[in-house]
Amino acid sequence: MTIKLKCLSHTPLRGLNDPGADVVAEVDAVLARSRAEVEAFDPELIVIFAPDHYNGLFYDLMPPFVIATAAESVADYGTLPGPLSIPRDLALDLTRHILDSGLDIALSHRLQVDHGCTQTLEELTGSLTRYPVIPIIINSVAPPFAPYRRIRKLGEAVGRFVASLGKRVLILGTGGLSHEPPVPLLSGAAEEIAEFLIAGRNPTPEARAARQARTIAAGKIYGTAESPLTPLNTDWDLAFIDLLVQGRLAEIDDFVVEEISTTAGRSTHEIRTWVAAFAALAAGGAYRARQDYYRPINEWIAGYGVVSAERR
């Protein structure tokens, strides 16, 4: 039994609003190394903690976290279409284990997932189906949010389960770091926007293209005086990475949602996926971790980081 972890940022603007060629080459190189490590590990199972961006989950029923026994990519921002290769019975066993651990996780037998889940699978495996994968989607953009201590406990429950399998398991967390793309809030939203946030599934191609164009436009001015969005916060990002690398996970229980939103951006809460992933790894004991990469990239509206870890 071997368990390894990779946490990395994702960005729908990759290839659509790129920084300089030298930065793109840096990211390409670190992703190539990460892919090679995944290839060498050859996981028998991947568990991916990921966010959603109002593509599969909406306010008509917004769970704090949900596990899927079947999932299909919405193929936004040019990501791969098609189903994920989910081992249904194993996903159900994991669901029962999480519920028995005192955590009320939601269950979906037909979930739509977006780039927040699929981009990382594509970058690290080249496919949505190469390895068996169980996706766990954590609400990271639609307040109110579950407290961070619940996310840590979710990760711990998942970690206890995967440790019992006797398999090579890769745990992925994807999102963040400091991050504020133009995601609307329900509070105070105009009627049309509110309706989308409540029940906006399966938009027309024209509506999806318009939404993506707004994100690209935001990326072109992000980090300048023209942008109304919270700027990237390198100090916050690096402090968070240090906390994870050093194994200080108990401190996460004291994270305050409003403070993070103000300091690092409203979508920084995608770090919940990193919290769950590291808590899952730590459930089996001490780990060793390393920071593979970090750079604030305004064009991608992301403090872009990559971190790897494994059990000692």
UniProtKB/Swiss-Prot annotation:
A GO BP entry: 3-phenylpropionate catabolic process
Molecular function in Gene Ontology: 3-carboxyethylcatechol 2,3-dioxygenase activity; ferrous iron binding
InterPro entries: DHPP/DHXA_dioxygenase (IPR023789), Xdiol_dOase_suB (IPR004183)
Catalytic activity entry: 3-(2,3-dihydroxyphenyl)propanoate + O2 = (2Z,4E)-2-hydroxy-6-oxonona-2,4-dienedioate + H(+); (2E)-3-(2,3-dihydroxyphenyl)prop-2-enoate + O2 = (2Z,4E,7E)-2-hydroxy-6-oxonona-2,4,7-trienedioate + H(+)
Keywords: Aromatic hydrocarbons catabolism, Dioxygenase, Iron, Oxidoreductase
The EC number(s) this enzyme carries: 1.13.11.16
Keyword rRNA-binding applies: no
Cofactor: Fe(2+)
Signal peptide region: none
Domain of life assignment: Bacteria
Active-site residue list: 115 (proton donor), 179 (proton acceptor)
Pathway annotation: Aromatic compound metabolism; 3-phenylpropanoate degradation
CDD domains according to UniProt: MhpB_like
Family the entry assigns: Belongs to the LigB/MhpB extradiol dioxygenase family.
Subunit (UniProt): Homotetramer.
Function: Catalyzes the non-heme iron(II)-dependent oxidative cleavage of 2,3-dihydroxyphenylpropionic acid and 2,3-dihydroxicinnamic acid into 2-hydroxy-6-ketononadienedioate and 2-hydroxy-6-ketononatrienedioate, respectively.
HAMAP family cross-referenced by the UniProt entry: MhpB (MF_01653)
Protein name, entry field: 2,3-dihydroxyphenylpropionate/2,3-dihydroxicinnamic acid 1,2-dioxygenase
Organism: Azotobacter vinelandii (strain DJ / ATCC BAA-1303)
